[in-house]
Amino acid sequence: MNKFIIFSLSIISFNISADLKQNLDKDIDILMEKVIEWRHDIHEHPELGNREFRTSKKIEDHLRSLGIKVETNIAYTGVVGMLEGDLPGPTMALRADMDALPVEEKTGLPFASKVRTTYLGNDVGVMHACGHDAHVAILMGVAEFLAKNKSSIKGKVMFIFQPAEEGPPEGEGGGAEMMLAEGIFDRYNPEVIFGLHVTNIPNGVLSVKPGPAMAAASAYRIKIKGVQTHGSTPWSGIDPIMATAELIESLNTIVSRRINIINNPAVVSVGLVKAGTRNNIIPEDAQIMGTIRTFDPLLRKQIYEEIEQIAKGVALGTGTKISVEFDVGGFYPVTYNEPKLVNAMKGSLMKASPGRFYESNIPVTGAEDFSYFSQEIPGMYFWLGINKPGVGLESANFGERTDVAGNHSPYFYVDDSALDEGVRAFVYLIDDYPGKF
C-alpha cells in the first residue's frame, strides 16, 4: 500500500450546504482535538481482529451519547450506527475498520502501544501499524459533527465500524464478509458506501483510483513433512527445511519468470516460515505461509497451479510430503471503485483538501475487504496522506516512497494534522451525494 502513481488535477464545480460548511469551519478545531485524543487512546490500546472489545465499546458509548441508534456484536465486535437526517434522501454508508496487527511498535511515541498477546503460538506485540486507529477516530468525529447538524442532512447515514479487516483468527469468520452475511445491508439498505485509508503519501493529499483500485488477496499455506533425525546424521532422515528453502526460492520465480505481468500485475510473497525446536534436530515438519495479489481471476488461477506444480516437484526431489492450501482465512476480491461514482464525487475530495487531490491511474497491490461492500452496492475507497507536513512535497512525483515508514511497519506514523482532511472528506461526501449519482 505504499506505491502510487497519481495524476491529473481536475477542476469540478461543487456545492455544499452553506450552513453545514460554516458549522464545520467553526467547529473543526474543537472537533479535531477530540479526534486526535480518541486516536491516541485507541493507538495505545490496540486489539487484534475479532477481539476489538475495548475499541467497540468506546465507539458504542460515543454513538449512543450522540443519540445515534446503535447495533453491536455484529461479526463478533462490529458496531453499526444509524443517523436519520431531518431532510429526505438516500441511506449512505461510511466505513472504518478497527483492528490492529501483530507488530511490536518501535515509533517511540508517548502513546505507543505496549500491548502484547499470543498470535500463532508466538508472543508478539500489537500495534495499529496500518492506521485503523485513525480511521475509527475520523469516523467518530464525523458521527459527532453530523449528529449535531442533522437538520442539514439529506437522508440517513450508516456508520460501519468493522472488525477483522486484517483477517480473523484461524477457524473464525469475520470482517466485511461476515457483517454482510449477518444482514447489515439487508436491515439498513444503504445505496452507496464510502471508505478511506491512511498511507504514507504527502500530508493531506486525497487520492482515488476509478475502477480496480486494490488487488484481490489470497493467503496460501504449504506444509512440508519429512522424517525427523539428529542434526549430526542428516542422511538418516528427510529434511523438511531443505525442501522449504527450495520452495521459497522457486516461489519467487513465479512472478519474475513465469508470468507476463506487463498488463496484469501480480505478487507472490512469503511472509511466514516455521520449522524446528533445537539447533541439532532436523525436524519432522515445516510450514510456509504467504500472500498472493492479483487483479485478474485467470491469473490468480494460474498462480495457484504454478504453486501446486512447484510443490509437487520439490516433494519428488526431496522425498518430503507437501500439501498446499489456498484462501487460508478467506479471500478478498478486487476493490472496485465505481467510475461513475468517482467522477460524480471527486469534487467532494477536492474541496476537502484544495489543491491536493489527485486521481490515480495505477492500482495498488494492497488488498481490502471493503471490496465485499462495494460488490453489493456502488462504493468509493480513497487514500489520505499522513506524512509529516513537508515530507514528500519536495518531489514532483507524489508516488515516490518517502522517508516515512509504510503501512504494516513497526515505525508506521500518522501525523495528526492530516486527520482534518479525512473528517472533511466524509462530511462533504455525505452532503454532496444526494441527487448527484
What spans do the regions from the language model cover?
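Acidic/His- and Gly-rich active-site-bordering loop/insert found
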Residues: 20-127, 137-155
